């Protein structure tokens, strides 16, 4: 049996439900969701679970929902007048402790989103994210190294690019991070949302946001440089301990998503419980 055929309870017997999902009601304004996402994007929760008036999950709101709608409505009206229920992604993946890893990852591939919810013993839901699966990667046994992972082009941006160009590139290339050209720094949906919330007052005093050049108050984050010889378990352990997991070699960048997809390999063994 390969690692991909093991169930979530076999892979994470002690910690599967240890991360409660974070919820927000559908009638809350978007600025509330954006403020919450500043703290949760790229964490073990990563997205907000949207609930109805009966507190039942109806979908998700994450970084992509915010930046996509900013691109379409780059004004404070989006944050102050729009409700979370109007931008929710209703394609919510629900799993159980008996779901195997392959089934989970195939669902993530179909939705282009590494996030699921799982019922817990407290009557609520726990979050299962790409960040969570780094724990699985850290405990696997394999000779797979970073150099064995699929090649993907580094998507970059330049100093004179506008925020409109940057956000459009994220959406076009289905990525949440762009590398600053010829550097080891990056911008992400989290950084954009954090800047809008904390520095630009949810665009209440800002006009023509999409025409803003990349400059202050936007601040970049650093990518950690690693060797191509780093194996999958070591990479997982490294990312697991990072606040914002993102690493690069001379020619490639890698996120927890890449680790998750590598776990589908038949060349990985795992001591299941």
What are the residue ranges of the model-derived segments?
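Tandem CBS (Bateman) regulatory domains
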Residues: 2-20, 62-93, 105-109, 124-156, ...
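The conserved cystathionine-beta-synthase
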Residues: 22-45, 51, 93-113, 119-120, ...
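Amphipathic alpha-helical protein-interaction segments
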Residues: 114-117, 126-128
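Short, structured interface segments that constitute the first stable element of a domain
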Residues: 174-192
């Amino acid at each position: 049996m390969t690692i991909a055929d093991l169930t979530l309870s076999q892979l994470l017997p002690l910690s599967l439900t240890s991360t409660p999902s974070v919820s927000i009601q559908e009638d809350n304004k978007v600025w509330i969701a954006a403020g919450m996402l500043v703290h949760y994007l790229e964490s073990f929760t990563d997205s907000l679970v949207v609930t109805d008036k009966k507190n039942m999950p109806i979908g998700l709101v994450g970084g992509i929902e915010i930046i996509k709608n900013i691109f379409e409505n780059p004004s404070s009206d989006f944050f102050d007048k729009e409700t979370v229920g109007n931008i929710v992604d209703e394609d919510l993946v629900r799993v159980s402790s008996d779901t195997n890893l392959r089934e989970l990852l195939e669902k993530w591939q179909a939705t282009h989103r590494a996030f699921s919810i799982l019922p817990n013993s407290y009557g609520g839901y726990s979050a299962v994210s790409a960040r969570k699966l780094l724990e699985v990667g850290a405990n696997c046994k394999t000779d797979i190294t970073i150099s064995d992972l699929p090649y993907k082009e580094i998507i970059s941006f330049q100093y004179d690019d506008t925020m409109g160009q940057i956000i459009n590139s994220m959406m076009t290339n289905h990525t949440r991070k762009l590398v600053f050209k010829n550097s080891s720094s990056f911008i992400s949906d989290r950084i954009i949302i954090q800047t809008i919330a904390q520095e630009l007052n949810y665009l209440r005093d800002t006009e023509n946001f999409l025409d803003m050049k990349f400059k202050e108050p936007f601040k970049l984050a650093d990518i950690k440089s690693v060797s191509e010889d780093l194996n999958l378990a070591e990479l997982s352990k490294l990312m697991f301990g990072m606040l914002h997991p993102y690493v690069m070699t001379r020619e490639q960048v890698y996120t927890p998503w890449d680790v998750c997809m590598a776990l589908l390999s038949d060349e990985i063994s795992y001591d299941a419980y």
